[in-house]
């Protein structure tokens, strides 16, 4: 089967936003206008086409990024709907990795919100070009200029409108295209009838002023345009479009559009802009991987059908009808169903059974998938998120993804023996799907402990165990993932010497421990000179330290952000062994615990609370009573916003508390920010509790 759409006419885009900015509704409308669905489903009635897991439909939030293929104006658009709830940032990270561009959806009343900041940061890390869609222009309190202002103030983004909305709230009914200087007026409720006219006299001065600002902003990052602009030359529509496209693809400029997905206005123009300004797979930097057998040999995966096949698996899902589905993005070459591929990451050969192109929750079987496309494979047994699939003769490993460690843990107990087996199966499958979900058995208590990115994350996973895997389980109280670190530097000795007839054990190390910068992790330096410890034992010293650090020195929590410099020691020709040096290193760490002032660290959450002004005093008092630090306050429309850092340990059950404190009128969102030292009195309680006192 020949390729239906050229690479130049392919767009892989994500739709990202804060929870409730209207992201799923926007995607729904895209599918409606591109002819993918015939009836519009509303998120708040639980009928949305993209939200296909039962829980998503109940909660009205998107959890997994479903990948959908749509067509618009002779282009293929692969859309990945990403979750806006902060507990699901891994889903966002995963989808950003395989996108070429994104549409950031903002709520016209709130502008940039905390989760928008998080997702924006992630998109910047991956260098993803973006356009911004300011949604909900029909909402009471909608303010286009305020929202654009938040892009500048909170994200320092070079973002400028390429449209001017006419009217706001219930008066919003038309949009001026500032590039072409045309007025688009909506004449029916479904948004399918649009009248295109010249910009009327009463709006002309405003539109021209905004167009001037737009040209100036683009000229700042485009020399050719700058010369013309300064020379007072006329800039044609095509020149302006080309300059906006260039600046957007280079991630130097973000076009801003307006609309209301719910009321069907502005979505088609946003689709036009996605095609006009977001890159095709040919416009983004080619992905650089390395040879499977040599990390130093770079291999470029070119977006070309005739190149060797290379793809990245970015999501694994268990589907009730076909079993395990592996979503992947093809970076180079083509793949036919029924063929064999190499999983270079795992070093295993896999057979691709069927290839499906997904449409939210319905699917279409295809025989070939081409370079630059996104599809799902059935039949891959060993492939997990972040693995590279490639041609057996041309093996390459594409860069994989980094996933954050869980910040919250719960114990789960199956209710019966039958549930025990089902639960083991469920945990394996859920971990395959979600790399930020961890499960292990506590060696001391025998309990199964699950870890994730927040309360909602774990709630949903436990709920999925019940629904999809029919596991009845009792869930314990949440536990915080504390960490430990050193505050002082000290040089210590760790010596292990055992003589008990026959061959003994001997290892002796001198190590200087010192605090590392926050987030710096563990750094090991080998400063041995003159062979006082033979080279072959050095890795054992590092391994011994790493193992011992896992269990900490105070209360059994992992020790982080520490530097260790091995500078002296001694060995015995006969009695020294790798094991002896491992033990010596762990003894040195025990010794360091006495001298390096170890402390316990706790996860601090960046919290934003929005509520009516009359509750401000109560909320501020409540934040302070939870050991929170208020970082700032501002008015947003007729509501007040409090931004604070609060320890995760104090935030359990906060949703219920906030509801009762504000009669259900307050909302909050939180995201993990950093680790901070726990106050002495609380640290003592944690240590006592962990020692069973």
From Swiss-Prot:
Q: Which InterPro entries match?
A: EFG_II, EFG_III, EFG_III/V, EFG_IV, EFG_V, EFG_V-like, EFTu-like_2, G_TR_CS
Q: Which organism is it from?
A: Macrococcus caseolyticus (strain JCSC5402) (Macrococcoides caseolyticum)
GO BP, sorted A to Z: ribosome disassembly
Write out the function statement from the record.
Answer: Catalyzes the GTP-dependent ribosomal translocation step during translation elongation. During this step, the ribosome changes from the pre-translocational (PRE) to the post-translocational (POST) state as the newly formed A-site-bound peptidyl-tRNA and P-site-bound deacylated tRNA move to the P and E sites, respectively. Catalyzes the coordinated movement of the two tRNA molecules, the mRNA and conformational changes in the ribosome.
User: Which keywords does this Swiss-Prot/TrEMBL entry list?
Assistant: Cytoplasm, Elongation factor, GTP-binding, Nucleotide-binding, Protein biosynthesis
N-terminal signal peptide = none
Provide the protein's localization.
Answer: Cytoplasm
Q: Which GO terms describe its molecular function?
A: GTP binding; GTPase activity; translation elongation factor activity
Q: Where does this protein chiefly localize?
A: cytoplasm
Q: Where is the tr-type G domain?
A: 8-282
Q: Does the keyword Nucleotide-binding apply?
A: yes
Disulfide bridge positions per record: none
Q: Which GO terms describe its cellular component?
A: cytoplasm
Which NCBIfam families has this protein been placed in? EF-G (TIGR00484), PRK12740.1-3 (NF009379), PRK12740.1-5 (NF009381), small_GTP (TIGR00231)
Transport in keyword set = no
Binding site residues for GTP:
17-24, 81-85, 135-138
The entry's protein name is Elongation factor G
User: What does the sequence similarity comment in the record state about its family?
Assistant: Belongs to the TRAFAC class translation factor GTPase superfamily. Classic translation factor GTPase family. EF-G/EF-2 subfamily.
